[in-house]
């Protein structure tokens, strides 16, 4: 038996991937692929 609360809400996971990324402190919205193009990868070190 748990500790029942008066106003229980259904469990909604807050994990990464369940919500669309929005612009905040990081540039999630800005860095998202919006136009269907491939991201421009800048090679910084030799592979």
From Swiss-Prot:
This is Small, acid-soluble spore protein N. Its main location: other. Keywords: Sporulation. GO terms for biological process: asexual sporulation; sporulation resulting in formation of a cellular spore. Belongs to the SspN family. Residues 1-47 are annotated as: Disordered. Induction: Expressed only in the forespore compartment of sporulating cells. GO terms for cellular component: endospore-forming forespore. It comes from the Bacteria. Residues 1-11, 29-47 have a biased composition (Polar residues). It comes from Anoxybacillus flavithermus (strain DSM 21510 / WK1). It is found in: Spore core. InterPro entries: SASP_SspN (IPR012612). The keyword Metal-binding does not apply. Transmembrane segments: none annotated.
């Amino acid at each position: 038996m748990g500790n029942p609360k008066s106003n229980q809400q259904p469990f909604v996971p807050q994990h990464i991937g369940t919500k669309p990324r929005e612009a905040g402190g990081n540039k999630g919205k800005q860095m998202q692929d919006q136009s269907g193009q491939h991201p421009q990868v800048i090679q910084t070190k030799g592979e």
